[in-house]
Amino acid sequence: MAVTWKKIEYEEEITTTASSSTPAPTGGSSRNLFTVTALAAGATFAAPSGTPANGNRLIIRIKDNGTARTLAWNAIYRRMEFALPTTTVISKTMYLGFIYNSADSKWDMVAINEEA
């Protein structure tokens, strides 16, 4: 029996913004990273741009500018075990991991972690 190895190529999209009241990540690549480096206002995260495929991944990294900021989420983001965060913690980095679920057309939050 012959075994053939196939190299799997991943598309990556990396986007960074200092601050926005309506941050809009990208979601059309298999791997997407969206970073907010100094959030200076409350933010409502818009639906990711692009056409996602089932299983696409999106990491959102958020840090405020030294003042806690409110966070809200478009309905396309769906909580799983943990609630979507509603505020930042002053000067702490937060990571949120999402996987696109094409059966429900939702970005399911599968991970959340915050700087200690």
What spans do the regions from the language model cover?
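Exposed extracellular interaction/assembly regions and N-terminal maturation sites
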Residues: 2-77, 92, 99-116
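Terminal beta-strand-rich extracellular "head" domains
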Residues: 76-90
